Amino acid sequence: MYPHPVIPTEPIGSIPRPPALLEAIASYHAGALGHDALERAYSEALRDTIQRFEQTGSPVLTDGEQTKPSFATYPLSGLSNLASDGVVIPFSDGHTRQLPKLIAGPFRYGVHAEGYVRAARACTQLPIKQAVISASAISLLYPEQGIPGYSREQFLADLVDEAEADIRGALRAGAASVQIDFTEGRLSLKLDPTGGLLKAFIALNNQVLDRFTEEERGRVGVHV
């Protein structure tokens, strides 16, 4: 009898939030639940997700992105130099998400992914993979009309610095690997069928990856 073939797999990142957490978030936004209670709900969802992941026998775990406000916009938490009328991103299932728009520089991340890694590491001894958003996705925050006194070139330079710091921070905090979410790669072909925007996205992300050694890049993957 031939042995069953083994296909190496690992989780991508996101796991649907449990009903209890969804109810807690809704209650918080309705003013019926305090911040401390919401944080407890986030912590319980995180612990439950990781425990269930452990039971699957997966060689690497994720936090399920249970505590992120969004896989794409978590770095923007707490920033005051944004407006709400940014680029609208359409997804293949028909839903859309609208990004904020940067209105002043300099650009800095409000939150880095290392905090999510530390929270997950406190729940397990198994390897953790941390998802981070790509520099190319965040580049969509810069408005077409520009920002007086803050050029697009300076914004991109600042962005590359922040994206590098996001990855390094996650690795330093104990992530076994880091996954760069680059799902806007497909979107770029809708916005620009010539492929020019896609090439620009790839070039920007490569600027970030070029700052890592070959050994370090062995711990960084890209999700498209």
Language-model segments: which ranges?
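Domain-level signal for soluble alpha/beta catalytic cores
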Residues: 1-224
